[in-house]
Amino acid sequence: MLSRHNIRAPLSTTGSALDKATPNQWIDWTSNASELSMRGGTLETMMGEYTRKWLESEGLIPENYQPEEGKVRFYANAKQRTIATAQFFSSGMLPVANIDIETHADYDKMDPVFTPATTFVSDAYVEAALKQIGAMGGATGMTDVCAGLAESYALIEDVVDYTESEGFKSGELKKLDTTDTQVTIEQDKEPAVSGSLKTACQLADALVLQYYEAPNAVDAAFGHDLTMEQWKLISESKDFYVDLLYTAPLVAANVAHPLLQEIGNEMDADGRVFSFLCGHDSNVGSVLAALEAEDYELPAAVESKTPIGCKLVFERWANANGEQFGRVRLLYQSVDELREGTMLPGTVSPESVEMSFKGLQKNADGLYKYDDLRARIADAAAEYDRIVEKDGQEELAQAA
């Protein structure tokens, strides 16, 4: 299970660009900037409880499971929001097991496994990767890559009263412009974006999180009574930011490489019953892109691809003849579940969407041959080495 952390406070602190972009007052959070909120912890415990009930109902674990050493693994990026997410989930899933959360970096530092950084970079690679990113804008490339966000930008500006903000009036912030986006790719750094998309993403992120956290939806939108479709429109800027930076084939194969290796190792680990890896939306998005996931839609979600607290679940099943099959699902809580904090009864599932992958065939039960699924993960991890080998060659742009 590859998880995105649950609800957190916005990444920016008081006095930041986020504050300067609106004359309105953001809500008071129950946690410090970037940290898991109390609501996020409660929701994550519920996700753990659902997982426990589901596994028990399938006969995969006994009630009040206390796993022997090596049977389960909880590994999180060393940020507060990811460690806390893993801790709350483990409390819900294994309430009497007192699970330790494994980290491999100093506290509050990014673990290389969960850091979506380009660890191989060359002039030829950057040129090819930027060409793929620009292709998201169609024939005109990077100039129009954000053209589809015009309505999202306009709604964000209206909701936060952007032109009445301190930053806009002082000239520090400019009107959101869909044509000023620039992407940079550097060695051992995360892909970065400059221009209006960065500002729009920060505002969309804070607004959507505030919508999840605040009791009153109108207050969350600074007095605007927004429809579900309008909240989705706001989220488009944030969602596209993740797509733009992390899901182009050459970029996904690069930034997801260490996590794909980790997932493969967990699936091969002898005796492992359950693994929980906790990271970020960029991790889930880049892994799905590297695995060549087909397009999908998420019912009852504001965020279109990797909603808060979502889990990418890799499952292995066997029939009476010992044949093994695989299934991959994206598990997430609906907007109502996030906002209301409601626990679903019994083994009723949160929202669940089955993933499909290009070039792989499902059987009549909607399952893949396990060997085919495992081979796809191995092939996606190996794509990194192929990119390195093809560096400088004409076919680099087709390597991924």
Language-model features: locations:
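Signature for phosphate-centric chemistry
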Residues: M1-K71, N77-S275, G279-A400
